[in-house]
């Protein structure tokens, strides 16, 4: 997995192969303009474009002194990052993409969303849709939520496999005589042929192994199977995986078995499609991440019932407003929040602070105009107002 950072100007020679046709060079530099993900078949790897908020304020470094070029190969063996930095980049990369993916699903017609046709989300609960990265997240989530299921399957698959089939062993194997007693060094157990249930498990664990080893997403997996790796797994990603899964599909009926099969099939269907193309055909990118950030915060704290007063009469727009208990008397009052898409260490400007005071004054005026309920906000005896907390995120 390759890591790029929004807003940073890279030397063209450093990232030209990574960016492909997604970014244009100017004066020998390529500036990353979007946040999100794409798979580049030229380098055979996923590329994550991170939000610029990890930039050190007032500097051209990131995460406390790293260069953007250091972070490009954060998950390679020659990386300059220590374990803590690498873990942060991994978690932040996945968090950023999940945020973008959720926004794109909820705002399919937004002009800031740029995605491939193959990455469209399906409304069917049974299907696995989105980009390759969405499929990978679905695989990891299924594994983490169903570890008891995997242990149960593995236990059942291997029960009885260590029992020796003495009739076949005596008929087909030559013993060694020791002190007049035959000793069979090579025995035949009761496993007669490929078990299709086990083949599905081998395929699934091989996918997890590939994700962990090649994409920089660490997944702690305990598995005793002989996994599909190297050139053989490459063949699976180029079409053999779909063929094998179609051959054993008839074996599965339970919901979890079918879900496991669908996840494996979706993975190989995605990889075979994007690797056979010469162009970048699997991507999900956002042109204005500050809008995504604001939407995410508002989904967490905003009050949908108050969305109508966000656009104020003086033309100003509140980012977040909600009702919550006053720390003074416990009555419900209004809280106003402002989302700031800043670099690490940046300070809030005087203009932003002034706007917050204006928002609070407008809230008071709305009470006079009858736009807001006055219960718990204005004291009927003194006609004084409870305070209006303002904060920045």
PLM regions and their residue ranges:
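Terminal, charged accessory segments of proteins
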Residues: 1-240, 256-274, 278
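Catalytic core segments in nucleotide and nucleic-acid processing enzymes
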Residues: 1-54, 273-393
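Helix-loop junctions and short alpha-helical segments
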Residues: 249-256
């Amino acid at each position: 997995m390759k890591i790029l950072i929004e807003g940073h100007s890279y030397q063209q020679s450093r990232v030209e192969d990574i960016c492909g046709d997604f970014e244009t060079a100017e004066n020998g530099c390529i500036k990353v303009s979007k946040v999100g993900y794409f798979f580049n078949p030229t380098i055979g790897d996923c590329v994550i474009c991170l939000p610029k908020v990890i930039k050190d304020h007032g500097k051209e470094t990131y995460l406390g002194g790293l260069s953007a070029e250091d972070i490009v190969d954060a998950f390679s063996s020659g990386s300059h990052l220590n374990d803590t930095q690498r873990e942060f980049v991994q978690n932040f990369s996945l968090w950023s993409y999940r945020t973008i993916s959720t926004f794109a699903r909820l705002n399919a017609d937004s002009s800031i969303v740029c995605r491939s046709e193959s990455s469209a989300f399906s409304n069917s609960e049974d299907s696995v849709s989105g980009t390759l990265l969405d499929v990978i997240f679905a695989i990891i989530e299924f594994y983490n939520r169903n570890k008891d299921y995997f242990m149960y399957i593995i236990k059942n698959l291997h029960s009885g496999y260590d029992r020796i089939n003495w009739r076949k062993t005596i008929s087909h194997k030559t013993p060694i005589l020791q002190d007049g007693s035959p000793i069979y060094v090579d025995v035949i157990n009761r496993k007669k042929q490929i078990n299709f249930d086990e083949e599905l498990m081998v395929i699934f664990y091989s996918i997890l192994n590939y994700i962990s080893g090649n994409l920089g997403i660490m997944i702690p997996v305990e598995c005793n199977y002989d996994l599909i790796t190297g050139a053989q797994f490459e063949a699976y990603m180029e079409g053999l995986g779909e063929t094998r899964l179609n051959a054993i599909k008839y074996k599965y009926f339970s919901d979890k078995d079918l879900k496991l099969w669908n996840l494996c099939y979706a993975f190989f269907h995605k990889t075979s499609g994007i690797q056979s193309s010469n162009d970048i055909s699997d991507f999900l990118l956002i042109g204005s991440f500050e809008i995504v950030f604001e939407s995410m915060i508002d989904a967490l704290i905003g009050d949908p019932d108050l969305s109508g007063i966000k656009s104020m009469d003086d033309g100003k727009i509140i980012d977040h407003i909600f009702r919550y208990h006053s720390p003074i008397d416990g009555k419900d009052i209004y809280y106003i929040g402002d989302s700031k898409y800043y670099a690490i260490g940046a300070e809030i400007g005087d203009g932003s602070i002034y706007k917050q005071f204006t928002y609070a004054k407008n809230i008071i005026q709305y009470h006079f105009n009858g736009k807001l309920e006055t219960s718990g906000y204005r004291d009927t005896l003194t006609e004084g107002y409870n305070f209006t907390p303002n904060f920045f995120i």
